[in-house]
């Protein structure tokens, strides 16, 4: 191989080679980026400005992956206090970066996506709204259970593997959730409950899922098992409730499939209620084991407040809430508008949204189980003319058919809540081609210590 640079011959790199590199940037997933002889390498736990010895792990045609063998220079933006376990599992893959710099990184992710994908550079991306206390914020935990060194353990999988790393302090989870997981782990050891073996397809307990209401403090425990019968389940329940009076719901889920999915289809309430209750922006919500409910309540409120402010609503406005889930965004809007029409493909979520509307005495919010495209076409025939269409899609973003259907409704504004800057930028580009202009962009940090960023954008009809 001959380099275009003055014909210099370059030795082809291979696995386990060790080279010295300088880190120039962070990838969108928070990995350090190093360039060496025409190759781009991605390195975990490496920050811009750092100089490292890197072991080559994998080499592709023009890129590769490496790991740090030694540091020659450390970035002043490095958080030296983070436990490397959190980086190895991906629990906190940006935990080695100071929080102020995490917020800057997330703003840059949004800016870069808008410029590279949508060609937009003339709209101000505001500074990321951060969290005052950016640790111990998650109100939900999904923890795998496996046998490690001969005993039942809870923790997280090493990145890109199914090797469990035992963990007691999960860093970004509510500390009371951590306590409950650790107590349940120790209790199940005493009762000799067999952990799931993924390779042999044996054992009983696959996962422990815990939810906690941020404001209510109510807690739910879900034991995911491979079969219905659980040995000494009454004694397990008694001990958990005795130690944690805030536990108001204990549920068993049966998952006997060879799958990476957390839950199977069958749920059975073993103790207490089917749901816990919590509040957001003054509304109460019944939250089931399966409900999609933002894991960071404090920052979700700021996210929704931003969406409401961008939409600039009045009592004469009609809002369509696409991807309405259990109604958290739509019901937050309902107080300030004439009506909210929500659509969601998951029927159980629609039932939850309807129940949550009733729970809060909200009578101007209507939820249907349907595709958004079909529901909007039906509403248009019924003469419903929205001022604002609110979208909060999954990471894959919007489909072309959805974009076309939403534009056909003719809203003056589209408020887009995104969890993926790349697909958001792609969708904004398409909306601009169809007559909408990007007006406002606000990143919000729902997931401190990780590379993930949420964003609210406002599109206005030209």
From Swiss-Prot:
Keywords: Methyltransferase, S-adenosyl-L-methionine, Transferase
PROSITE patterns xrefs: SAM_MT_RNA_M5U (PS51687), TRAM (PS50926), TRMA_1 (PS01230), TRMA_2 (PS01231)
Residues reported in the UniProt entry to bind S-adenosyl-L-methionine: 294, 323, 344, 392
Name of the top EC class for this enzyme: transferase
Residues covered by the TRAM domain: 12-70
MF terms in GO: rRNA (uridine-C5-)-methyltransferase activity
Active-site residue list: 419 (nucleophile)
Pfam families, A to Z: TRAM (PF01938), tRNA_U5-meth_tr (PF05958)
Gene3D superfamilies xref list: 2.40.50.1070, Nucleic acid-binding proteins (2.40.50.140), Vaccinia Virus protein VP39 (3.40.50.150)
Superkingdom as given in the UniProt entry: Bacteria
S-adenosyl-L-methionine recorded as keyword: yes
GO biological processes: rRNA base methylation
EC numbers: 2.1.1.-
Protein family membership: Belongs to the class I-like SAM-binding methyltransferase superfamily. RNA M5U methyltransferase family.
NCBIfam families reported for this sequence: rumA (TIGR00479)
Name of the protein described by the UniProt record: Uncharacterized RNA methyltransferase spyM18_1360
